[in-house]
């Protein structure tokens, strides 16, 4: 199957230049690229679809280029509202190294069709202002640039600086440089990048007469229509496990709504059309089993954190709800699992009772409620039922010397952390 046909059944083509011409070009191996600016020290879930697209093309025999925006990161792609904060060179360089490591886990840099990683600072920083205006700027109409949606929105509100206004020219020049050096003929990106990407197609045509192509992926939203990738805490869902634990990552996809889970399986996984059709039947006929969500969570955690992490977080989920041993969890997995809960911190030297712990962790609101919970058999510490109101933990009960998992009933739990 031609890669373009594959992308079409998956619903992964939002906009493109001449699709028939692109399909014909992809009958033979091509070189394509996607750029990532180092505006943070980690990529996030919003970057996933284009990153996975690079792998899809590579597995179909095409050569991907990952472009790290060492130059464009200093400028910042215009947002709908407000100027971006300028980043220092040290910050840019730190972010670049972090992002490069993450990109290397998505595409192969050896074997067949090995990927290439480039930094647009290599050609942008050495270009003089005169050369840039003469060789790039002269090929752009101000009317066309002003017609870009993001630019129009900014001009209608708080305006836009010349710096950010020029961003599309820098990105267009990237495409020209990659076409010259690597015969790169396709740029892919998110739906909000369409204007910048077609600027590169136009610039290639004007400076060398070369026919190149553009393709953007759909905007991904959750079941509530909110921008994809927001964690339950309201922040971004990061690829860096230090920022978003593997457990939180898994839980995000496990909680995907029925209305979006099949799209997510098409967009984010490498499952076949037949496998996804079977899961679609499960959603329609047995939604309460959440088979599609579980498979999605497994596939996405495998992809970003590795299979061992998937096994660990599934064990953690079982352990938190009393279906497996908490003692089998390593400290990082336990910490990640409890990061989604209330953490009650116990100062060094204090020895609270089970009643104090239940109240402190917010599982009950009074001593009377705590006593009733204990009497009714609903108080658990590390999945062991507590039957005495006077119970206090001893050192041998603490997980990794510092933690307790406190549970009320079947589903309400919290973490207790003892200070050293």
From Swiss-Prot:
InterPro entries tied to this protein: aa-tRNA-synth_I_CS, aa-tRNA-synth_Ic, Rossmann-like_a/b/a_fold, S4_RNA-bd_sf, SYY-like_C, Tyr-tRNA-ligase, Tyr-tRNA-ligase_bac-type, Tyr-tRNA-ligase_bac_1
Motif 'KMSKS' region, residue range(s) on this chain: 227-231
GO cellular component terms listed in the entry, alphabetical order: cytosol
Top-level taxon of origin: Bacteria
Organism: Corynebacterium diphtheriae (strain ATCC 700971 / NCTC 13129 / Biotype gravis)
Gene responsible for this protein: tyrS
GO terms assigned for molecular function: ATP binding; RNA binding; tyrosine-tRNA ligase activity
Location within or outside the cell: Cytoplasm
Predominant cellular place of this UniProt entry's protein: cytoplasm
Keywords for this protein: Aminoacyl-tRNA synthetase, ATP-binding, Cytoplasm, Ligase, Nucleotide-binding, Protein biosynthesis, RNA-binding
Enzyme Commission designation: 6.1.1.1
Name of the protein this chain belongs to: Tyrosine--tRNA ligase
């Amino acid at each position: 199957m031609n890669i373009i046909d594959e992308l079409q059944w998956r619903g992964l083509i939002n906009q493109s230049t001449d699709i028939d011409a692109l399909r014909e070009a992809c009958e033979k191996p091509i070189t394509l690229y996607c750029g990532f600016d180092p505006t943070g020290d980690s990529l996030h879930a919003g970057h996933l679809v284009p990153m996975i697209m690079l792998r899809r093309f590579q597995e179909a025999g095409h050569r991907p280029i990952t472009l790290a925006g060492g130059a464009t990161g200093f400028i910042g792609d215009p947002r709908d509202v407000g100027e971006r904060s300028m980043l220092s060179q040290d910050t840019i360089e730190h972010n670049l190294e972090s992002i490069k490591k993450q990109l290397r886990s998505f595409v192969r840099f050896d074997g067949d069709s090995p990927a290439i990683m480039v930094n647009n600072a290599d050609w942008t920083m050495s270009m003089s202002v005169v050369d840039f205006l003469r060789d790039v700027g002269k090929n752009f109409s101000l009317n066309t640039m002003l017609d870009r949606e993001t630019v129009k929105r900014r001009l209608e509100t708080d305006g836009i600086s010349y710096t950010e206004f020029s961003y599309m020219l820098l990105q267009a020049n990237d495409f020209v440089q990659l076409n010259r050096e690597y015969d790169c003929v396709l740029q892919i990106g998110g739906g909000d990048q369409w204007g910048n990407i077609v600027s590169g197609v136009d610039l290639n045509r004007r400076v060398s007469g070369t026919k190149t192509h553009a393709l953007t992926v759909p905007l991904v939203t959750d079941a509530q229509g909110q921008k994809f990738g927001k964690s339950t805490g309201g922040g971004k869902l990061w690829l860096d496990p230090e920022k978003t634990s593997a457990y939180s990552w898994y839980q995000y996809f496990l909680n995907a709504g029925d209305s979006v889970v099949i799209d997510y399986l098409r967009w984010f996984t490498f499952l076949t059309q037949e496998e996804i059709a079977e899961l679609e039947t499960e959603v329609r006929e047995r939604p309460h089993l959440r088979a599609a969500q579980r498979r999605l969570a497994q596939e996405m955690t495998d992809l970003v954190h590795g299979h061992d992490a998937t096994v660990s977080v599934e064990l953690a989920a079982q352990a938190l709800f009393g279906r497996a041993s908490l003692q089998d969890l390593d400290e990082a997995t336990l910490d990640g699992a409890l990061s989604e809960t209330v953490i009650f911190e116990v100062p060094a030297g204090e020895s609270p009772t089970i009643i104090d712990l239940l109240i402190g962790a917010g599982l009950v609101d009074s001593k009377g409620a705590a006593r009733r919970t204990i009497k009714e058999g609903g108080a658990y510490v590390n999945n062991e039922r507590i039957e005495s109101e006077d119970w206090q933990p001893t050192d041998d009960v603490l997980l990794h010397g510092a933690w307790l998992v406190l549970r009320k009933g079947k589903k309400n739990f919290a973490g207790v952390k003892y200070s050293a």
